[in-house]
């Protein structure tokens, strides 16, 4: 069994340890979770995080990169992008994790270090980048592209043919109509219905979703 560490000791990492990894192990495609690494000043040697040891700061992985792989469990897209890209450039291997009940259709691709939560569905001919998070019960339509390090929260639906950029944060229960383009670094607030393209770096909110310049 391959050995794994989670980078990030917050709620995201603890969810992955508690729900996704046990299911993968039951299927025989899992990992031995060695522990958690996190740069937080509150952690010290000997600390346990929901039953798993805190191993050290993120540079810990550099000394063990030939023996273990890593999954970045940091929710913020931009922070995750900086960390995962830096570690990949240094030869760290990143594992993709898939939860119970998730379905990934044939001819779809998932990049390294992505996390697919339970009951999420990815339709045919989709391209999902590196370090992407698809939370519980997300629905991805056919021929969708999702850029690296984008995070999509529970219950969101992305219709066929949409192109989602890199480092995009999409809240829960969002719906994006077919064929829309969401620019890099955009943020879509929870519950929004997106009928139009969204420019890079902007924040949209509501039904129909409109730009909120005051929040940018």
PLM features: residue spans?
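NAD(P)-binding Rossmann-fold cofactor-contacting core
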Residues: 23-46
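Short hydrophobic segments within beta-strands
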Residues: 6-7, 37, 73
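Glycine-rich adenosine-cofactor-binding loop
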Residues: 2-21
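Active-site catalytic pocket residues across diverse enzymes, especially alpha/beta-hydrolases
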Residues: 20-24, 87
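Short active-site oxyanion
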Residues: 3-4, 32-34, 67-70
């Amino acid at each position: 069994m391959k050995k794994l560490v989670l980078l990030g000791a917050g709620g995201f990492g603890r969810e992955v340890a508690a729900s996704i990894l046990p299911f993968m192990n039951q299927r025989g495609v899992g990992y031995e979770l060695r522990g958690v690494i996190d740069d937080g000043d509150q952690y010290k040697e000997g600390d346990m995080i929901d039953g798993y040891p805190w191993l050290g700061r993120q540079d810990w992985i550099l000394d063990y990169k030939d023996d273990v792989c890593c999954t970045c469990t940091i929710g913020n897209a931009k922070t995750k992008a900086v960390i995962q890209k830096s570690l990949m450039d240094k030869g760290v291997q990143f594992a993709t994790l898939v939860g119970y009940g998730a379905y990934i259709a044939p001819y779809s691709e998932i990049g390294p270090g992505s996390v697919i939560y339970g009951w999420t569905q990815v339709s045919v001919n989709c391209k999902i980048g590196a370090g992407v998070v698809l939370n519980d019960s997300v629905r991805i339509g056919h021929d969708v592209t999702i850029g690296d390090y984008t995070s999509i929260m529970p219950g969101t639906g992305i219709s066929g043919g949409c192109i989602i950029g890199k480092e995009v944060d999409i809240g829960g229960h969002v719906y994006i109509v077919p064929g829309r383009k969401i620019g890099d670094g955009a943020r879509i607030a929870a519950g929004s219905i997106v009928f139009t393209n969204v420019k890079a770096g902007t924040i949209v909110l509501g039904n129909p979703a409109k730009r909120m310049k005051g929040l940018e």
